[in-house]
Amino acid sequence: MFLNYNKSIDEAEKIKNDLINKRFDNIKIEKKVVNEDPPLPFNLVKLQSYCSSHFGYNPADVMDITQSLRETHKAITYNRSDCQYLSEEHFKEAPKTLAQIVQNIKFKPSELDPTIHSKCFNDKNITAHFAIIPTNNKVDLNKLTEREKNVYLAVCKYYMAQFLPKAVKEKTKMTIELDGEYTLVAYSTVVLKKGYTAIFKDIKAEEVTELSSIADGMYSGTAIDARFEEKETKPPSRYTKATLNEDMTRIAKYVTDPEVKKMLLEKDKDKKGENGSIGTSATRSTIIDSLITKGYVAEDGKRLISTELGRELYRILPDEIKKADMTAKWWAIQEDIPVSYTHLRAH
């Protein structure tokens, strides 16, 4: 229950010995009720990540599947969107859309309420597009392939979640100050009301302990036992197609030049969910597949690994080309083109 990170074995052993049979008169219990919003509807990157983790589909496949759902079956809205928000006009259309979805998938959550106004309905966060949602067209699930059906149902579920109550949880935190030198902390969460989570079978259960049964306040007690776990730090996980695809939406975090980082972030200032990105929703999966096709990157199961050819190319490239900084500079040049063109036409 107690957490203590980055301690040597000797330090951990000392803390453990200090704790056993020690009397504490400063055990603080804090409780807080939290209302949890449903996840936003999908944009393409989020949908690709979801389908990778739940169905094993790679990003390019999801692009093709959503293209078919949109063009052939008229089942979903524009599929290459980089936005997770909807307009107030969409909210007005919700009763009709929900009624058709319920008819299409033969499922209606008991608490579904088209008058619930979730945070996804915000005109200020709309870009050139809006979130990927079901249309109000009739869709015959029997005419969809298994992959199309899985993706369509995921889009429906995330849209319907916007019209379900928030999940209500009670979070309990226990804090013990150890001689002013260490702080020991334990947490427990209990779900008071499932709300939207009732339709998400894949959500991990909250860790509930006896701590949740203790009321707010200060307590005294004696530690009867203590132990620690010895673990080694792990290197960052290798990318999969989906995680690389998603990380390309926030490449600015890898930029060290503050001016260039500012430029990248400025590029995406009106895009919720993208923070200094490279590529677009429509091109990122193609870029990744191109690296594989050209032999610079290979797949090891789901993991992506650099090839000898890729590492050699990286070695001989100029440092400037290797950095995300170049994307910001290219963007700045492209921004100047329309201005210059307009100036030329005016003269």
Question: PLM features: residue spans?
Answer:
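Short, amphipathic alpha-helical interaction segments positioned at domain boundaries
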Residues: A99-I105, E312-Q334
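Long, highly charged, low-complexity internal segments
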Residues: M1-E71, Q103-N104, D123, L141-I278
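Conserved small/polar residues in nucleotide/adenosyl-binding loops
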Residues: T342-H347
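Extended, well-ordered alpha-helical scaffold/bundle regions in very large, multi-domain proteins
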Residues: Y57-T115, S306
